[in-house]
A protein has these predicted regions:
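Active-site core segments that coordinate phosphate-bearing ligands/cofactors
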Residues: 1-133, 138-175
């Protein structure tokens, strides 16, 4: 399956990885824009405050993101056949267009390519997943990334205390 990357674990075991090129790059751009809007209104917030407060709203959004659809492809995405990035937000005139649904749609969009790869592993290869161990910036805002990923994958997601530090932290510990 060309959608799946074969990589080695630190102890040399070969594993299949559902790799995504785009994760939260589009979300990052929107958070920056919303921060600029807040600043234009006289509110000053750190990047951490913006992420924690704005991403938290996603947990109050509608399960279907209010009918909002986000394709956060800043760059191409091999797993879904896109050679170039074209970020897109689409909605109908009767969508429930709220901040919570906007943020929620972008968080789910960040996981779409990975979910496509998981579907290949689960359906075509018969792989089984008992738990996902989350790490990286997607998990820095308390609870949000963990709950969104669990909903997107239908799998429990656990985090270590250092989850927000990502893979580089683990590699540093192994060195």
């Amino acid at each position: 399956h060309p959608e799946i990357d074969l990589v080695s674990t630190p102890d040399g075991k070969l594993v299949g990885m559902a790799h995504s090129n785009n994760c939260s790059s589009d979300m990052d751009a929107w958070i920056q824009l919303l921060g600029e809007a807040a600043e234009a209104l006289g509110a000053k917030a750190s990047t951490t405050e913006l992420y924690n407060n704005l991403l938290q709203t996603a947990l109050d959004g509608d399960p279907d993101c209010g009918g909002l659809l986000s394709y956060g492809y800043i760059s191409g995405e091999h797993i879904t056949g896109f050679e170039e990035g074209r970020p897109l937000l689409a909605r109908s005139s009767n969508s429930h267009f709220t901040l919570a649904n906007f943020i929620r749609a972008h968080l789910f969009s960040a996981l779409c390519a990975m979910r496509t790869g998981l579907d290949v592993l689960l359906k075509d290869e018969g792989a089984q997943i008992e738990e996902i161990r989350g790490h990286g910036g997607f998990f820095k805002s308390p609870e949000v990334g963990q709950r969104i990923m669990a909903a997107a994958t239908g799998t429990p997601v656990s985090l270590l205390q250092s989850a927000g530090e990502g893979g580089a932290w683990g590699i540093a510990l192994l060195a």
